Amino acid sequence: GGGNLEKSKVIQWFTDVCKSDSIKIFHNAMYDVCWIRSMGIQLNGTIVDTMIAASLVNENRYRYDLGSLGWDYLKQGKNETELNSAAKEWGIDPKADMWKLPAMYVGNYAERDAELTLGLWKVMQKEMSDQDLNSIFDLETDLFPCLVDMRFLGVRVDVQKAHKLKQQLAEEEKQLLQEVNKETGVDVQIWAARSIAKVFDKLNLHYERTEKTQAPSFTKNFLSTHEHPLVQCISKAREINKAHTTFIDTIIKHEHNGRIHADINQIRSDTGGTVTGRFSYSNPNLQQIPARNKDLGPLIRSLFIPESGCEWGCFDYSQQEPRLVVHYASLDQDTSVFGVKDSYLQDDADFHTIVAKMADIPRDQAKTINLGLFYGMGKAKLQAELGVSKDKAEELFTIYHERVPFVKTLMNSVSNRAQQRGQIRTLLGRLCRFHLWEPSQFGIHKALPFGEARQEYGASIRRAYTYKALNKLIQGSAADMTKKSMLELYKEGIVAHIQVHDELDISVEDDIKAKRIKEIMESAVELEIPNKVDYESGKNWGEIR
């Protein structure tokens, strides 16, 4: 009714279109393609996504929805007036329940969406060509079918074990809180500072207060390092509570037929993704599954299991960030890095040990400084991470930069490039832009777009956040490497369950397959020094250290 065509005829026509070898242009392709696949319809031809293109053209936008991009690039928005009016009359949600409306109310809206997507693609093709982004767009486009398969494959979870573990942890939490109540008489609410304060008051223990309101304040670090056994009970109860309410409940909620099919955010968008090109996950966020807690981390990760007859294989790029630093310093012909480069070429080197020997400082301090500088960490944060006084930290920084000069030289080189050009380009051609400006003099100021910054601060301005340029170069290049390796694996029919940080988690049938995966990942992108992939396997994710 309502002018709708017969469903079977529409499906047949749509199926024929999808089976053709013509290019298919989408906006937010993951949503549409997953729906098409769930209908059992085969989709042939190259799939291009204008949302991915828009993110490569400008990763710093606030919104990537079709309407916003349409206005900005085509001066035309979505046609929603008739749709919203009809939905109001019918008493339904115009987006969630659009399928309930007759075609005559939806047609114009749908046609405008198609017009905007096609128009946007024409604009994006020129933008990407002008900015030399075609090669990185090709990588993202070629990878897309792999990510669709990855989402449909999902990851198996032991649901029965999850329920048992939740009960076990809830009981442990209950016992810890009963111990606190027994000694103090306080029925403590572990996430309420005022409630925790009552326990401290009963025990005559000191605690911090907020500066403005003088309310009790309890940080995670304060509680976890406190010597009193009852405070340790509260700290442990909080960790256990978070484990079963945040992580295990999430696994149980999102499980479907024994699998989790998370949303994979390929690139920066309205629903997730990152400005550097790294993946993110949602519904649930698999990258938040804990690893650092030596007791709870393995327990929760043990709920993730491989395909039947397989082992859980973890393939981790070894020291990916340090290797990229050595690669870029070598490209700049910095002679102070040549010794480090030779160590990698001759043997399986450890960057942090090499730097520790160069600077004559302990390895743990060398590693903290290395990673802090790579991640664009400020001096105050780095000092806190080192756990030393300000004077000692300054002494360490001076020694480090004198004896390991290539790191600071590279930092300055990349930062200057960002300041002069307003952008840097990653290993495989991704652009990271620095679009905000601040006053040239040091101080705390809000970074603003160029026009607003000129008006607010005058002519003496500079690009903001260029001190993070090395971090963006490394993170973006690491994303390039990981995506290229996933594409090369996909060409051999290998699809990962999870991509988290520098690792890919894959079901592995035997050592031959594991060896082949290592080879593909190590050779996917060529650096000035060899890549190395560490491999571990176990019955589940939790058995991997």
Question: Each predicted region: which residue ranges?
Answer:
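Metal-dependent catalytic core segments for phosphate chemistry
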Residues: 1, 321-358, 442-462
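Conserved "right-hand" nucleotidyltransferase catalytic core of DNA-directed polymerases
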Residues: 1, 44, 61, 71-74, ...
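Conserved RNase H-like, two-metal-ion catalytic cores of nucleic-acid enzymes
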Residues: 1-68, 72, 292-297, 326-328, ...
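A short acidic-Thr-Gly-centered motif at the start of a beta-strand
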Residues: 14-18, 296-311, 489-491
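Conserved catalytic core of nucleic-acid polymerases
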Residues: 152, 205-208, 224, 357-495, ...
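Short hydrophobic/aromatic beta-strand micro-patches
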Residues: 385, 505-509
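Helix N-cap motif at beta-to-alpha junctions
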Residues: 390, 509-513
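A common structural junction motif
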Residues: 404, 519-529
